[in-house]
Amino acid sequence: MEEDLLGICGFDSSKKYRLEELAKYQSGSCIEFEDDDEMAVDYPCPFCSDDYDLVELCHHIDEEHQLDANNGICPVCSRRVKMHMVDHITTQHRDVFKRLYKDESYSAFSPGTRKYLQSLIDEPLSTNHTSKSVLDPLLSFIYNPPSPKKSKLVQPDSSSEASMEDNSLIRDSTEKDWESPSPLSDTELLEKAKKREFVQGLISSAIFDHIYNF
């Protein structure tokens, strides 16, 4: 029974300590940190139920809540922000990162955490994440332009092809009919003249015979 009471008291005192430290961050009264434990304040993620220190929280939001990070309650100042949460924290609560960078506990961070913290400190005060989110659709459009619509190839109907061939044949035969005859040779002209004289002789003979008999 006594152990249960001690456990409850210990949990309440730890929770009270965390709330007091969080209040120091939010009020700005904590200017200098005398103990390393004062830096170990966990903040609740505004988009899930997990707790992180401030550097881990920013990294967690960048990795897990990139699409939801443009609107939420800041865990540091408890204000609703309508910009990228990491941009808000790095601009409005930049002094916390600088203290972390100067504190001795910085050496205890992993290389990846130190690199990420350095990038947050070196990042300009402009809304870097917001500009990236605006440029992403534009870059996507530039590097992936919409494919041009392919025109449909109309297959000619077999009946239309047959009618076109018939018209072509008729046109060719008509042109041949209207073509001027080729000039006759001298032999052909002579034979044609003889035939004409022979026919004329027959006609003349028939006429004379008719007159004579009459």
Swiss-Prot record:
Induction: Not induced by abscisic acid. It is found in: Nucleus. The keyword Acyltransferase does not apply. Residues 156-166 have a biased composition (Polar residues). It holds the Pfam family zf-Di19. Expressed in seedlings, roots, leaves, stems, flowers and siliques. GO terms for cellular component: nucleus. Residues 168-179 have a biased composition (Basic and acidic residues). Residues 148-185 are annotated as: Disordered. The modification Phosphoserine is found at residue 110. Keywords: Nucleus, Phosphoprotein. InterPro entries: DI19, Di19_C, Di19_Zn-bd. Phosphorylated in vitro by CPK3 or CPK11. Belongs to the Di19 family. This is Protein DEHYDRATION-INDUCED 19 homolog 5. The lineage of its organism: Eukaryota, Viridiplantae, Streptophyta, Embryophyta, Tracheophyta. The gene is DI19-5.
